[in-house]
Swiss-Prot record:
Protein name: 26S proteasome regulatory subunit 4 homolog
GO biological process, one term: mitotic cytokinesis
InterPro entries cross-referenced by the UniProt entry: 26S_Proteasome_ATPase, AAA+_ATPase, AAA_lid_3, ATPase_AAA_core, ATPase_AAA_CS, NA-bd_OB-fold, P-loop_NTPase, Prot_ATP_ID_OB_2nd
Residue numbers binding ATP: 225-232
Location relative to the cell: Cytoplasm; Nucleus
Organism, scientific name: Dictyostelium discoideum
Residues annotated as transmembrane: none
Cellular component terms per the entry's GO annotation: nucleus; phagocytic vesicle; proteasome regulatory particle, base subcomplex
PROSITE patterns, sorted: AAA
Chief site of localization: cytoplasm
Underlying gene: psmC1
UniProt entry keywords in alphabetical sequence: ATP-binding, Cytoplasm, Nucleotide-binding, Nucleus, Proteasome
GO molecular function terms listed in the Swiss-Prot or TrEMBL record: ATP binding; ATP hydrolysis activity; proteasome-activating activity
Pfam families reported for this sequence: AAA, AAA_lid_3, Prot_ATP_ID_OB_C
Length: 439
């Protein structure tokens, strides 16, 4: 019995040595476990169990290694099959994005004021001024007051700058191809040709001659005389002989419809001439814009006077233009404003009179050099005539005589054809013209 008691006490001691039972911790979340998606779960390797070293763990690790090798091979093949992206294609993609941001069509406006790097005040032709944003891809070094900018059609944000913009009318005035006329095509006018060379051609080709002698070359010349005496022809010959840029404009083109467009066109004309220096600006029929000033209530007359004032400013402004020469031509120099043709602006006035006997003979020889003339043609009869014939009249007589020969199916021009042509030209000039046209 005692043994039983001692055995019972030993069992109680063993129970005291065992740890007490602890319940498991409560779950942190209730319900079904949510599946995680994203880059972490796709790149995370699976957990290998059991953790002890055994054959099963080795097989699982080898299987994971095979999957990783397959993934590596797939990525290598994918990179090889992808087209190579060079810098040009990247730039093209960026330009495409910029074009999408700009939108289409674009509105043209003027930059009135720059507030900061990202904002400006612009004005457009379709409305008032606007406070707009400047997009980040715009080259801000090209922005200046008065610049022509491109605006988004909806938000009117500045999305571009038109650099080096030139008035389309000024581009039309620029003579791209040199005229074919030369000094050999001018009959007579030796004194006029010499004066033109000294005033226009030599300062552009040999400016050092004027520096050595210590004088400033003339800024411009004016050619005046009756119609058809060779003023425009001499200007074309100068353009042919020099390699300078030749800008030709008629005086009536400087008269514009809207207020301020005429002076703006004059500024654009001389700005392009300055950029393309050495250059020659030929203004034909200058009397259309350079007439004498007088008090007038007409808005059109005041606009013409403003255009002439801008022309005066460009001729003798503060900016000295040594490589820009001005040639003017007119039939009525007495109607021009004295301020326009004073020395300092127009230093030489070259008169073109009606041709004398010697000049007439040269002009007839030039225009009949390539004509098939009959043996009975006597040009001295027309040269010695007392009729006031200009160079243009002589050219018209030669052309008309050839047309009369073609009318009769002849390939040679006779003396009779010249007589009929002369009578026809003189009739058109005097009796056939309105009274007072050539006064």
């Amino acid at each position: 019995m005692g043994n039983n008691q001692s055995q019972g006490q030993g069992d109680k001691g063993e129970k005291k040595d065992q740890p007490k039972y602890q319940p498991p911790p409560p779950p942190t979340q209730f319900g079904k476990k949510k599946k995680r998606r994203g880059a972490e779960t796709s790149t995370k390797l699976p957990v290998i169990t059991p953790h002890s070293k055994c054959k099963l763990k080795q097989l699982k690790l080898e299987r994971i290694k095979d999957y990783l090798l397959m993934e590596q091979e797939f990525l290598q093949n994918y990179d090889l099959n992808q087209p190579k992206v060079d810098e040009n294609s990247k730039e093209q993609a960026d330009e495409k994005i910029i074009e999408e941001l700009r939108g289409d069509p674009l509105t043209v406006g003027n930059l009135e004021e720059i507030i900061d790097d990202n904002h400006a005040i612009v004005s457009s032709t379709v409305g008032p001024e606007h406070y707009v944003r400047i997009m980040s891809f715009v080259d801000k070094s090209k922005l200046y007051l008065g610049a022509t900018v491109l605006l988004n059609n909806k938000t009117l944000s500045v999305v571009g700058v038109i650099d080096g913009e030139v008035d389309p009318m000024v581009n039309v005035m620029k003579v791209e191809k040199a005229p074919t006329e030369s000094y050999s095509d001018i009959g007579g006018l030796e004194a006029q040709v010499q004066e033109m060379k000294e005033a226009i051609e030599l300062p552009l080709t040999h400016p050092e001659l004027y520096e050595e002698i210590g004088i400033k070359p003339p800024k411009g010349v004016i050619l005046y005389g009756e119609p058809g005496t060779g003023k425009t022809l001499l200007a074309k010959a100068v353009a042919n002989q020099t390699s300078a840029t030749f800008l030709r404009v008629v005086g009536s083109e400087l008269i514009q419809k809207y207020l301020g467009d005429g002076p703006k066109l004059v500024r654009e004309l001389f700005r392009v001439a300055d950029e393309c220096a050495p250059s020659i600006v030929f203004i034909d029929e200058i009397d259309a814009v350079g007439t004498k000033r007088y008090d007038s209530q007409s808005g059109g007359e005041r606009e013409i006077q403003r255009t002439m004032l801008e022309l005066l400013n460009q001729l003798d402004g503060f900016d000295a233009r040594t490589d820009v020469k001005v040639i003017m031509a007119t039939n009525r120099i007495e109607t021009l404003d004295p301020a326009l043709i004073r020395p300092g602006r127009i230093d030489r006035k070259i008169e073109f009179p009606l041709p004398d006997i010697k000049t007439k003979r040269k002009i007839f020889e030039i225009h009949t050099a390539k004509m098939n003339l009959s043996e009975d043609v006597n040009l001295e009869e027309f040269v010695m005539s007392k009729d006031d014939l200009s160079g243009a009249d002589i050219k018209a007589i030669c052309t008309e005589s050839g047309l009369l020969a073609l009318r009769e199916r002849r390939m040679r021009v006779t003396h009779t054809d010249f007589k009929k042509a002369k009578e026809k030209v003189l009739y058109r000039k005097t009796a056939g013209a309105p009274e007072g046209l050539y006064m």
